[in-house]
Amino acid sequence: MIPSVITAALTCVALIVTVCVFPQKKIGKTNISVYAAVPTIGAVFALITGQVSLGDVLEYFTLSAANSPVKIIILFISMSLLSVYLDETGFFEYIAHLAVKKTNGSQAGIFVSLYVTASVLTVVTSNDIVVLTFTPFICQFCKRCSINPVPYVFSQFVAANTWSLLFIIGNPTNIFLAQSVDTDFLSYFSVMWLPTVFAGVASFVMLVAVFKNSLKQKIVPIEDEYVLKERSFTFVGLAFLVFCTVSIAVLPYFELEMYYVSAFFAIALFVTVIVMRAVKRQRPTVVLKTLSRAPFEMIPLVLGMAIIALSLNKNGVTQAICSLIGEEDPALKYGVLSTLSANLLNNIPMSMIFADVTGYLSGDVLQKAVYSSIIGSNIGAYLTPLGALAGLMFTSILSRHGVKFRFTDFMKYGFIVAPVTLAAALAGLIIIL
């Protein structure tokens, strides 16, 4: 048991340190995500030292269950490809320009507009995509208008990691935890809609309270126009994303798994675009750019952490944790512990470990534990930058754009907004369950 705990702890610490210090290394013209290799090294060490057997790993990876790591990776990457494609066509920037244009120079209006826009786009895509595409736009916009970007960038980060609770596909951590109890799209939504609404309202109210004094000054609106250069390709991508989401929602009626559908739509989109480009005698540049931005680093990251989580499970660590937590007040306990653990381990390792921990529960206690852990995995992302990989990338983007937003600044706002939002979300969950 102890070797497994030490391996897991060292791997999580090394992962966070690597992301903070040197997350990427440029080899030629390609940026390699160094941090993704850390869990793989930890997993190999666990195998070599006999903490888990190769047979156990192969059996786990070939599971027919919905929470198979391979299925989760396919689902996440294919959904990400659909979203990244839209970003490559300029869709997100176009929507952001429209949102800002309607505010007539009011900072409060811009604040509300960007929060709502980030929330809506998160619901139809995913939190990581919105954070990584919206943050540079907001930084550039605020620089041109000579206004403080912090209220806007932090609010869209909070919006993305709050409204990502609504659908199972909104965050990979939702998928890890929900699929561990074979939850489908509609079953997930039927539970999480109220906690998400409660959390969304609470987070917005807290953000307004924190930043209201910074939003009183009027600014001169920028009159430039942003036009989608190739509307047909944008509409095709949007149609595929919408149809994919709807198809995933009705899957229970056809006994199909989510990863089949998402992979089909991602492949079908690329084939369609390649054919459209070929007809126009153009290179499929947008497809190549989309593939170059795909989160393939999730493959070694997830597989490595899955092996480490399996080692903890096989050596009785997760069962011991479950016994230690107990079965009283599961929503409160797992909600708070998952939020804190996400900021000690990062939310992806945390969700994989908690999926195993909750596996020893049953009935109503299991449901409350799983869904409250999902809430913690999302809201924990804005308690500190360590809560999610997107948080660390978020601070890196701000640094590259010259925005002064230190670790302590993030925590100052996070410790005000996150606890209230967490309490609201858990209250909604307790009402539903």
Predicted regions and their residues:
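Membrane-core helix-loop-helix motifs of multi-pass transport proteins
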Residues: 1, 140-232, 365-366, 393-427
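Membrane-embedded alpha-helical segments and adjacent helix-loop junctions characteristic
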Residues: 58-147, 284, 297-363
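Transmembrane helix-bundle signature of multi-pass membrane transporters/permeases
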Residues: 116-119, 137, 154-164, 192-197, ...
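Helix-loop-helix module between adjacent transmembrane segments
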Residues: 79-87, 105-109, 117-127, 158-167, ...
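Hydrophobic alpha-helical transmembrane segments
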Residues: 8-17, 55-58, 104, 133-149, ...
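Membrane-helix interface "capping/anchor" motifs
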Residues: 20-33, 143-151, 345-346
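Hydrophobic transmembrane alpha-helices of multi-pass small-molecule transporters
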Residues: 1-84, 194-200, 204-314, 413-433
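Re-entrant/interfacial helical elements at transmembrane boundaries that shape
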Residues: 95-96, 129-140, 153, 166-181, ...
